[in-house]
Design a protein with these regions (language model features):
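N-terminal pre-Walker A segment at the start of P-loop NTPase domains
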Residues: 1-14
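A structural signal for the main folded, soluble domain(s) of proteins
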Residues: 6, 22-23, 156
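Phosphate-binding P-loop
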Residues: 15-21
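Hydrophobic anchor at the beta1->P-loop junction of P-loop NTPases
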Residues: 26-28
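Conserved lysine of the Walker
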Residues: 34
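Conserved P-loop NTP-binding catalytic core
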Residues: 39-108, 115-118
Length: 202
């Protein structure tokens, strides 16, 4: 389940932030950005599922350049940035069907994708930053809304306060399988599609 989402450089979103509850209703007039929010979730889900960035972009509506925020006529943002805070299942299954319990169930995932020209003079898409870490209680605004008596139902108690970095491509530091991390992200995003209701307002 997604608890917080920040988007920058995707379609109409510029430093856009939204917090989610177990049931969230998105209401607004036509062309207010509701569809763009679901398009962003769709892109995030595909990016977590596939290894080919271009494939994930091509599956979206329109040309890939149109997914970047248009700043002026024929001028588009160079980067798309996502920041997702999520509550994931307490167990994860790997590619071989093995299950393992998770120590941390509240995570923050950050992803930055940039447009750049490759050596052949063709515009390409590259991941310039990818970061996944656990959220401490003090950093998790969503968990502050949960009554203390039911807090353990949402996230297990962790006695250590040391932050664990699960993915950090900027430092080329890998402390767990990228497959599992992306699968957790994908599960959280897919779960969000069932808990968010979109409504048109006249």
């Amino acid at each position: 389940m997604i608890t917080y989402l920040k988007i920058n450089g995707f379609k109409s979103f510029h430093n856009f932030e939204v917090s989610f509850t177990p049931l969230t209703v998105i209401a607004g007039i036509n062309a207010s950005g509701k569809s763009n929010l679901f398009d962003a979730l769709s892109l995030l889900s595909r990016l977590a599922e596939v290894d080919n960035i271009k494939k994930a972009f091509k599956e979206q509506h329109g040309e890939f350049i149109e997914l970047f925020t248009q700043l002026d006529r024929d001028v588009y943002a160079q980067e798309i940035e996502f920041c997702v805070e999520m509550l994931v299942n307490r167990t994860i299954k790997d590619a071989w069907g093995n299950k393992a319990p998770l120590r941390y169930t509240c995570l923050r995932y950050e992803l930055t994708i940039r447009r750049q020209t490759n050596s052949s003079g063709i515009e390409d898409l590259v991941v310039v930053a990818e970061h996944l870490e656990n959220l401490k209680h003090l950093e998790d605004n969503w968990v502050k809304q949960i009554p203390k008596e039911t807090l353990r139902d949402w996230r297990p108690e962790v006695k250590t306060g040391k932050k664990v970095y699960l993915i950090c491509l900027q430092k080329q530091k890998m402390l767990c399988q990228l497959y599992l991390c992306r699968k957790m992200v994908c599960q959280a995003i897919d779960g969000a599609s069932h808990s968010i209701i979109r409504r048109e307002r006249c």
